[in-house]
């Protein structure tokens, strides 16, 4: 290197800047694009980088000509030419080398090139060298391959061939770090190989970062294949190469807040800065500059301090409060306000007057309560409130402080007292003054904000701003933050967006790379958070915005969850009429009307067809019903209604009837009941809940809402008709679902036979579709039995039947073939404190009955375990029989005459399987139809229930029938009769002996044959009755005996009819006859499992013998929940657990 030093170092005697000035006349004017005195001083750049010993006049001339040549070379490279960009000087000798010894200069095509003299490994570094690099201005226009060039540096480094980052031919990198240049090889260079470099500036980050990191220059290109960008990210990534990596900060000197972007600072100055002036009108020529001067100059005489904002000036004025006037004012001076030409007589008055200009409440508008500093501004503002007032002129809008004052805030720091009068003299007219002042504001704002980035000059003007006071809800300028996506468009009208401040897309400048990367990362995090769910293309998408705006209530939420809660509970649109939108066609056009619970109705109105209409063609759709016990309570023993109960019942029933007359919020056409109605919940496309006025995006979400969260879950049960039921085939089977399991096997509608209508509570036909015109009107006292207890000292806890329990089929659902199913499917909230016993439970209930929730609603059998329940439903329940066998044909005799069988002791004996305890107590049927004979009338521990509650099923032929009426046990409370006066009426001797279970086998043919026989049971040696051979099972071949909870149950397979879910709850038939019970449950023997299959004859006999020998297990405590395996120490906690917390409610529709 020493032998290549400059041979004549003392050739340069004159200053470096003089040499450049001499050569400027010969250099083209484009030189200033690269070398500018304003960008960097020549003394600092050239004199320190090029010493006198290594710079000659020829080299200065070469460097001067280099600027134009580089611009031409850059354009050539943009056209695809990859040749070197620096034209060499043919007269330059190789002995002027100033670079490292491993390199040398050579001539190629008349240009100076740098090559290696020896083999160089990867990572060979030379430096540091003084120098400077800048953006290539031509590359921004022509998209050249070289975005950066060296504007100063050692001569040998300037001769290096430059290539773009994406070009894989480069073998070294020249970068700037700490204000110095370094050169490092990125590939192994062989001897004689040319150096091809690219430039990276690590200091100012003005580089093509994406080009460097995503190409083979520094990183392998195969990394691009593993990067998946969203469409929005790809668009943002396309502008990253030209984005500005912002390392500058933008402070607000008034508030002391630093902002990372100019946009944020501009918004702060316009809306949030404490030193801003909100509503100021244009001032006149003589005092227009004073409004600006007050924010920088102290108005006190002989005080030359200047401040950047009004807050600093206000704090400064406090220092003058204690100063006396004579200390301040020279002789002949006066205190004159520079804002309004007010002359004060004392310092105190002048001080108070100045504060009136600084406060916003000096002159306040009575209409909008905006404050103004001068009365003239207030008067001009009040013109806007005049109805016939003219709109503000464009010139007035240009003079508004939002255009001048706020834009001037950053620039006032650079203003001095001498500059302000010059700007005042330049304003001759009003329009000219506004234009000049605005332009000067913008220029000084740019000078203040971009003094560290001279290459960026945003060319904003007054058209970029909009100062119109328009209250609108625009879509966010940020694509990732607006609920109105630009590629979809809003589904609601949105006002025009008039930006109050300029955004980066409004300013012709390069966007900030930090904001682009922030938006890209925001998209990624939002995608990860919300997943790839499908949303309707209205407002929401998988890229959910951070916040949302309710346009009805004019509220913007920064959290989407808060917005959804608002729309569900608080939005005003929930109570307004809403039109159907094409996106959600199922939205009702009219909101459901509010129902008044005080609507008066009578007991006759409850039964008329106008209040209750049903659709016989659509069994799945039922209208409202009333409880059978309601009418009995209303009528009373003497035919007088109870006023208190009547008002309560009427309120509940009127609400339910009005509610159920509407299907999906639309009135039902009661004049034409034959028109089939569409079940809204069974519609797979339904997504709107009329009760809550919520439209869901998916039907599955809607179904979950209806099952767990709908407001109708908390309504009285009569308001929840069968139309609110979820279709059985649309729900998944759950093991703990006790009341809805049979829905999985419901037959099709066409398989259900027609139904014979029954009268309602023996009331004469009142033109109601629920009552039969062929039935005579009889007394209520002969049809129903009293509900009473015969245990001494035990009082029934709930004698009154509550309307909240709705297990029975009410009136107007009785004329459809699915009425009994609707009875069982009623969504009744479980209220154990008011739970009354069903018929089968009353037959077998003792004071220590077990509260169990695995109950077959068809057979009225409770189970202790889920496995027993499932085995019963799969193998033994009559409802499931149609899945294995064809439907049996209906018997000609629809309703048999069970009265003869009931009155025949012979039949009741032969059709019964008597189970005895070891004590030898025997029950025998009495000929008069009562429960006990006279010698058994004194037995203790027996509980009397009505015979109507014992009717679980009827004859085999009756299994084909679907009885339409379910009489609730409370319905017999008011009944009268001579027979019912007996304390033991309703209990047969074959039903109970010490809690043993007896199952009546009822076959109608055998009952007719045995009608005239009256055999008597004889006591055997073991104390049990001697049974006839044919009277023990007496089962048809298609039936099986099943041990259920310690008792026997008959199971009929082939002749079962699927429509017999409500047999167990029918207390009466035609001609007012009673049906004998054939099955009941025994909760005392509650731990035996259900037989999973059809037992053989031997198994049947052994099972019967086991029941006869009294092998039932002892009962467990009633305070133990088997489902949850929890033992409670008191009944109150147990009831609370069952009501609210038990796991049996997991599949229910109520809590």
From Swiss-Prot:
Region annotated Disordered, chain positions: 1-102, 389-487, 636-683, 1051-1095
Compositional bias annotation for Acidic residues: 18-33, 70-82
Chain positions of all zinc fingers (CCHC FOG-type): 244-277, 542-575, 681-714, 848-881, 1113-1146
Gene Ontology terms for molecular function: DNA binding; RNA polymerase II-specific DNA-binding transcription factor binding; transcription coactivator activity; transcription corepressor activity; zinc ion binding
Subcellular location: Nucleus
Residues holding Zn(2+) 3: 689, 692, 705, 710
Gene3D superfamilies for this protein: Classic Zinc Finger
Sites where the protein binds Zn(2+) 2: 550, 553, 566, 571
Keywords carried by this UniProt record: Activator, Cardiomyopathy, Differentiation, Disease variant, DNA-binding, Gonadal differentiation, Isopeptide bond, Metal-binding, Nucleus, Phosphoprotein, Repeat, Repressor, Transcription, Transcription regulation, Ubl conjugation, Zinc, Zinc-finger
PTM sites of type Phosphoserine: 532, 581, 904, 1014
Post-translational modification: Sumoylation reduces transcriptional repression activity.
Ranges annotated as spanning the membrane: none
GO biological process, one term: negative regulation of fat cell differentiation
Motif Nuclear localization signal mapped to chain: 736-740
Polar residues bias: start-end ranges: 401-410, 419-431, 447-485, 647-658, 1057-1067
InterPro entries assigned to the protein according to its UniProt record, in alphabetical order: FOG, ZF_CCHC_FOG, ZFPM1/2_PR, Znf_C2H2_sf, Znf_C2H2_type
Cross-link (Glycyl lysine isopeptide (Lys-Gly) (interchain with G-Cter in SUMO1)): 324, 471, 915, 955
Disease: Tetralogy of Fallot: A congenital heart anomaly which consists of pulmonary stenosis, ventricular septal defect, dextroposition of the aorta (aorta is on the right side instead of the left) and hypertrophy of the right ventricle. In this condition, blood from both ventricles (oxygen-rich and oxygen-poor) is pumped into the body often causing cyanosis.
Role: Transcription regulator that plays a central role in heart morphogenesis and development of coronary vessels from epicardium, by regulating genes that are essential during cardiogenesis. Essential cofactor that acts via the formation of a heterodimer with transcription factors of the GATA family GATA4, GATA5 and GATA6. Such heterodimer can both activate or repress transcriptional activity, depending on the cell and promoter context. Also required in gonadal differentiation, possibly be regulating expression of SRY. Probably acts a corepressor of NR2F2.
Complexes and interactors: Interacts with the N-terminal zinc-finger of GATA4, GATA5 and probably GATA6. Interacts with retinoid nuclear receptor RXRA when ligand bound. Interacts with corepressor CTBP2; this interaction is however not essential for corepressor activity. Able to bind GATA1 in vitro. Interacts with NR2F2 and NR2F6. Interacts with ATOH8; mediates indirect interaction with GATA4.
Family of this protein: Belongs to the FOG (Friend of GATA) family.
Protein name according to UniProt: Zinc finger protein ZFPM2
Biological source species: Homo sapiens
């Amino acid at each position: 290197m020493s032998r290549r030093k400059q041979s004549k170092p003392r050739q340069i005697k004159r200053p470096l800047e003089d040499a450049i000035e001499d050569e400027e006349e010969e250099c083209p004017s484009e030189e200033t694009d690269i070398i500018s005195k304003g960008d960097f001083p020549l003394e600092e750049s050239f004199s320190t980088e090029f010493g006198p010993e290594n710079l000659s006049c020829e080299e200065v001339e070469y460097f001067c000509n280099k600027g134009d040549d580089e611009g031409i070379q850059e354009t050539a490279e943009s056209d695809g030419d990859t040749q070197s960009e620096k034209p060499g000087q043919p007269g330059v000798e190789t002995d002027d080398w100033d670079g490292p010894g491993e390199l040398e200069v050579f001539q190629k095509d008349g240009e100076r090139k740098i090559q290696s003299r020896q083999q160089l490994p990867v990572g060979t570094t030379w430096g540091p060298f003084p120098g400077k690099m800048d953006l290539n201005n031509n590359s921004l226009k022509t998209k050249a391959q070289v975005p950066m060039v060296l504007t100063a540096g050692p001569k040998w480094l300037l001769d290096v061939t430059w290539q773009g980052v994406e070009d894989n031919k480069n073998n070294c990198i020249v970068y700037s770090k700490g204000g110095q240049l370094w050169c490092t090889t990125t590939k192994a260079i062989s001897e004689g190989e040319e150096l091809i470099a690219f430039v990276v500036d690590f200091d100012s980050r003005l580089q093509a970062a994406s080009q460097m990191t995503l190409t083979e220059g520094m990183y392998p290109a195969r990394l691009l294949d593993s990067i998946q960008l969203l469409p929005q990210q790809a668009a943002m990534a396309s502008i990253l190469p030209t984005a500005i990596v912002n390392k500058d900060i933008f402070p607000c000197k008034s508030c002391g807040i630093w902002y990372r972007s100019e946009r944020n600072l501009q918004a702060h100055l316009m809306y949030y800065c404490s030193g801003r002036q909100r509503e100021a009108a244009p001032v006149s020529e003589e005092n227009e500059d004073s409004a600006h001067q007050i924010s920088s100059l102290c108005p006190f005489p002989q005080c030359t301090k200047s401040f950047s904002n009004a807050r600093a000036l206000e704090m400064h004025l406090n220092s003058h409060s204690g100063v006396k006037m004579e200390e301040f004012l020279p002789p002949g001076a006066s205190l004159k306000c520079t804002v309004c030409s007010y002359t004060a007589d004392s310092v105190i008055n002048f001080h108070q007057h100045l504060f009136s200009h600084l406060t916003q409440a000096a002159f306040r508008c009575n209409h909008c309560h905006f404050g103004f500093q001068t009365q003239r501004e207030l008067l001009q503002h009040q013109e806007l409130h005049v109805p016939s007032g003219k709109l503000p002129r464009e010139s007035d809008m240009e003079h508004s402080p939002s255009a001048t004052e706020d834009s001037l805030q950053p620039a006032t720091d650079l203003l001095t007292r001498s500059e302000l009068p010059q700007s005042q003299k330049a304003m001759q007219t009003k329009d000219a003054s506004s234009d000049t002042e605005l332009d000067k504001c913008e220029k000084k704002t740019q000078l203040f904000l971009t003094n560290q980035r001279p290459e960026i000059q945003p060319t904003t003007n007054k058209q970029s701003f909009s100062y119109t006071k328009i209250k609108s809800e625009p879509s966010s300028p940020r694509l990732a933050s607006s609920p109105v996506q630009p590629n979809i468009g809003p589904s609601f009208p949105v006002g025009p967006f008039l930006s109050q401040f300029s955004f980066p897309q409004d300013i012709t400048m390069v966007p900030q790379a930090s904001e682009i990367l922030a938006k890209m990362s925001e998209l990624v995090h939002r995608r990860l958070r919300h997943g790839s769910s499908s949303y309707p293309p209205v407002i929401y998408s998988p890229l959910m915005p951070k916040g949302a705006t309710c346009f009805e209530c004019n509220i913007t939420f920064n959290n989407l969850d808060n917005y959804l809660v608002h729309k569900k509970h608080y939005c005003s649109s929930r109570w307004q009429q809403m039109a159907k939108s094409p996106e959600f066609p199922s939205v009702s056009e009219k909101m459901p009307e509010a129902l008044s619970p005080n609507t008066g109705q009578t007991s006759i109105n409850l039964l008329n067809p106008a209040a209750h209409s049903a659709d016989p063609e659509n069994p799945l759709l039922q209208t409202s019903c009333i409880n059978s016990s309601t009418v009995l309570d209303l009528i009373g023993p003497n035919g007088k209604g109870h006023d208190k109960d009547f008002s309560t019942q009427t309120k509940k029933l009127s609400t339910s009837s009005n509610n159920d007359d509407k299907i999906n919020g639309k009135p039902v056409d009661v004049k034409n009941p034959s028109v089939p109605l569409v079940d809204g919940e069974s519609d797979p496309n339904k997504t709107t809940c009329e009760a809550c006025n919520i439209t869901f995006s998916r039907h599955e979400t809607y179904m979950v809402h209806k099952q767990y969260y709908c407001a109708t879950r908390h309504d009285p049960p009569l308001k929840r008709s069968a139309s609110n039921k979820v279709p059985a085939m649309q729900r998944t089977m759950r093991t703990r679902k006790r009341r809805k399991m049979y829905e999985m096997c419901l037959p099709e509608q066409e398989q259900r036979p027609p139904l014979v209508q029954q009268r309602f509570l023996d009331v004469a036909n009142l033109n109601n579709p629920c009552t039969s015109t062929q039935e005579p009107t009889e007394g209520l006292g002969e049809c129903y039995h009293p509900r009473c207890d015969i245990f001494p000292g035990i009082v029934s806890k709930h004698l009154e039947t509550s309307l909240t329990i709705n297990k029975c089929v009410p009136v107007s659902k009785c004329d459809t073939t699915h009425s009994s199913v609707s009875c069982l499917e009623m969504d009744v909230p479980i209220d154990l404190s008011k739970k009354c016993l069903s018929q089968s439970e009353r037959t077998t209930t003792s004071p220590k009955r077990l509260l169990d929730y695995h109950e077959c609603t068809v057979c009225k059998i409770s189970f202790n375990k889920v496995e027993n329940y499932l085995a019963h439903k799969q193998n033994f329940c009559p409802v499931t029989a149609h899945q294995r066998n064809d439907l049996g044909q209906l018997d000609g005799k629809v309703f048999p005459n069970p009265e003869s069988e009931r009155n025949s002791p012979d039949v009741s004996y032969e059709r019964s399987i008597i189970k005895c305890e070891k004590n030898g107590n025997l029950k025998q049927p009495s000929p008069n139809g009562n429960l006990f004979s006279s010698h058994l009338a004194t037995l203790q521990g027996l509980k009397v229930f009505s015979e109507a509650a014992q009717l679980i099923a009827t004859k085999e032929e009756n299994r084909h029938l679907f009885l339409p009426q379910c009489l609730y046990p409370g319905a017999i409370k008011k009944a009268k009769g001579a027979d019912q006066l007996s304390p033991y009426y309703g209990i047969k001797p074959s039903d109970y002996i010490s809690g043993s279970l007896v199952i009546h086998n009822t076959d109608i043919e055998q009952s007719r044959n045995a009608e005239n026989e009256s055999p008597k049971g004889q006591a055997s040696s073991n104390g049990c009755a001697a049974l006839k051979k044919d009277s023990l099972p007496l089962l048809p071949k298609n039936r099986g005996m099943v041990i259920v909870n310690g008792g026997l149950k008959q199971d009929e397979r082939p002749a079962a009819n699927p429509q017999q879910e409500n047999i167990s709850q029918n207390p009466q038939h035609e001609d007012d006859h009673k049906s004998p019970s054939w099955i009941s449950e025994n909760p005392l023997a509650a731990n035996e499992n259900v037989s999973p299959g059809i037992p053989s004859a031997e198994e049947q006999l052994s099972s019967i013998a086991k029941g006869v020998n009294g092998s039932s297990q002892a009962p467990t405590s009633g305070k133990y929940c088997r489902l949850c395996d929890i033992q409670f120490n008191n009944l109150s906690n147990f009831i609370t657990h069952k009501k609210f917390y038990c796991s049996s409610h997991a599949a229910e529709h109520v809590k």
